[in-house]
Amino acid sequence: MTASHDEAGLPKPGEAASGTPRNEPSSEPHDEPPAVGGELWRWQLVGDDAVLVDLPDVETVARVGEALRAAPPPGVVDVIPAATTVLVRGSARGRHRWASAARRIAEGSSGPSHVPDAVPADAAGDRSAGTQAAATGGAVAPGPPGARVVEIPVVYDGDDLADVARLAGLTRDEVAARHVAGRYRVAFGGFMPGFAYLTGLDPALVVPRLATPRTRVPAGAVAIAGEYAAVYPRATPGGWRLLGRTDTVMFDPAHDERPALLVPGDQVRFVPAREQIVARASDGADEEPRGVDAPPGAVVATPAEDEALAATVVATHAEDEALAATVVATPAANEQLAATSAVIEVLATGPLVLVEDAGRLGLAAVGVPRSGAADPVALRTANRLVGNRADAAVLEVVLGGLVVRFGATTAIALVGASLSAEIDGEPVLIGRTVRAPAGSTLELGFPTTGLRTWLAVRGGVDARPVLGSRSTDVLSALGPAPLAAGDVLPIGAAFEGLPEVARPVDEAALGSTSSSVTRTGDADLEHRQGEGHVVVLPATPGPRIDRLDDESRERLARQVWVVTADSNRVALRLDGPPLVRADDEELPSEGLVLGAVQVPHDGRPVVFGPDHPVTGGYPVVAVLTAEGITRMAQRRPGDRVRLAIR
């Protein structure tokens, strides 16, 4: 087999750098990835916009992650350390340049505190201020001397303390004492914002997860599972063993520069407490307390290691609304906004309408997903049509039904599902710039095909940003609440040019070329291009495709799957004859990307959407291309799809 490499010299997934299949020895050692510290590092392309490096141990992960977060090359937007890998995400355009630079930096990280000078001095000028701050905010040396040390007070009265004592052959007090005696380090962020996987657990306390996960673990629960320790930032289902509780706030989205108390590289000490004490951090300077009580709330989500619950359907509870940065806080605020002209008044919604933009960048290392529009191409297209910046906030409408009134004359554009739309009774074409007069009303019908429609208005939707983005993240309960009748949305000034002039168009021919799928996400076209009523999802091989047996690997590219009813923005779930893993060996958690196709134990693929967890513990066997992601965003329950892996 002959390997294909991009210009960065990185092999396709499933192939060694020398061109041999994974797990087979190379006959050309000079082409292998370089040996660092006596161990081979394996680099692979992941999808259109990421690279993954396999590393020998958690210490190497810490060094590489630290070096890349401290000096990210231009074009890199996120660095995601995990158990034995580091995933680097960046721009799809020019990946060979930033991937080569990232590889040089990573392979030059010779020690815990060494950051090689491998990026041009003006590199920071190529990143937005928000991305630069996020990417460098976690650049902390992982070990002594001078490491940041965080003390977390714990009341040891957990529901599983007695069971852990029994499994370990210890008393309850001995379990608590051994937990306190540990010296922990943050290895990586996990399934939800602020959830940090801590290494350094006493081997005597290494116990299995619960056979049946709890439906609710309270915020502040101090827990262990396998070789890791952690603190739950928010209430959630989970299968870890609970030793105690803390009142320490682990994650606060109001702190833009450092929303998570713990970042990779931090050292953690648990101290016994019998009264409320806030966390202390020592890094050579006094710090204000982070807070004392985590706000109430629950998100239906799971740790990446809790495989029985991975990528669950997510629902935000009513109490979470206090955490969400809602578009409009009060009826009085609505009335005040309505008195101005540059607003959109929501008269009615269909099943779901969200505010979305390009998402949150640079925060994956502390468990914050990127989120953003379900179809990034549609977001850019809609914004281009009205002369906005590519990342301006739009409305993402699920199954139509939206009715809005414009307070001032503006330009709008609709992109996505095939549906009827009218402004004051006059038809509106999908994928075209349209003038909306002051006081006019836009009504969206139910789509004949497809699922999502994006509405862009000139200037963008000016919802309050949370952690640098106006996007609603249903997994993490970040960003604006779903829209409701009566909401009034301010229009911003995210301009970048003039609206595109509407051209005469043959309505029947709209989206009649293959490029229209990628350009506008036209849903009718997707079905016409499919095989009968099977929608083809273009994809590339995933980094763990070799974890399938030979028959399943071959079947992966021809199997027709059915989209299930529990699909959402977190993941598209597929049903069909299950795939078979080549072995039952557990896979350490590693970073995920939009469009990653993961195969859990039941063998039925899960295709991750924009609100996916940051890390996952199942093999990623394929990754959708940009065109595949566009088509995925339009899939309804019952649709039939096939992965076209190239």
Range-by-range predicted roles:
Residues 2-14, 20, 24, 28-646:
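Conserved "landmark" site that anchors the functional core of diverse proteins
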